[in-house]
Design a protein with these regions (language model features):
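Periplasmic-side early beta-strands and strand-to-turn transitions of outer-membrane beta-barrels
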Residues: 1-71, 75, 102-116, 123
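Face-selective signature of the C-terminal outer-membrane beta-barrel domain
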Residues: 40-46, 77-104, 120-206
Length: 206
């Protein structure tokens, strides 16, 4: 296993908190079985976690890291692989089955200002399953190799952009209400406008 930690090198002037922090951990475990004289199995499982707190991004106009909304990146990964081998008299047959699941979340104060313009989130859930079957002839005057491979992967992504009160005022209401050619005044009861987007992307092959 392993553990990673860093408390960052820069501070956000808005709240005096450090940005660029990092923490994570990983664990890997392998188990082997001698099922019989000719059959063996090997399983490896792994888990990894990492989280970064904020980003050392600054607005070019000020040259200062100074933003008010939450920023972070978080990722979890689970992997497992099972290998089973059968050693026959004239060939070896192997089955390799693997599974992986990833969840990550990237959330940004997209304007990187101490004002509430808009934020972005990109959250991904991805699962994949693979199966590999390999037959291999034993050494002799000649040898041979054959196999079959298949996989399935599905990715679900949620990527909302949230327009916040300063962004609503600057981009929408002020432009309309200060335009003499538009005979109406507009306003929003909700200080936030979420613009939702969702994607599902399955992939498979043999």
């Amino acid at each position: 296993g392993n553990i990673v930690y860093s408390d960052g090198f820069y501070k956000n002037a808005y709240n005096a908190k450090k940005v660029g922090t990092e923490k994570g951990a990983g664990l890997r475990w392998t188990t082997q079985w001698q099922i019989s004289r000719t059959v063996t199995a090997d399983n490896t499982a792994a888990f990894n976690y990492s989280q970064n707190g904020g980003y050392e991004y600054e607005y070019v106009g000020s040259g200062i890291i100074n933003y008010n909304d939450t920023c972070f990146y978080r990722r979890n990964t689970v992997r497992d692989a099972l290998t089973v081998k059968w050693r026959a008299r004239h060939f070896t047959l192997s089955s390799i089955t693997s599974f992986q699941h990833i969840t990550d979340n990237l959330t940004l104060d997209q304007d990187f200002l101490p004002l509430s313009y808009f934020t972005l989130t990109q959250a991904i859930h991805e699962s994949s399953l693979t199966q590999d079957i390999v037959a291999r002839g034993k050494a002799g005057f000649y040898t041979w190799l054959g196999g079959l491979f298949g996989f399935y992967k599905t990715t679900r992504m949620r990527a909302p952009v949230t327009l916040k009160d300063d962004g609503i005022a600057t981009l929408i209401t002020d432009r309309v209400n200060n335009n003499d050619k538009i005979p109406v005044m507009i306003g929003f009861d909700n200080p936030e406008i979420p613009l939702q987007s969702y994607f599902r992307m399955p992939t498979w092959g043999v």
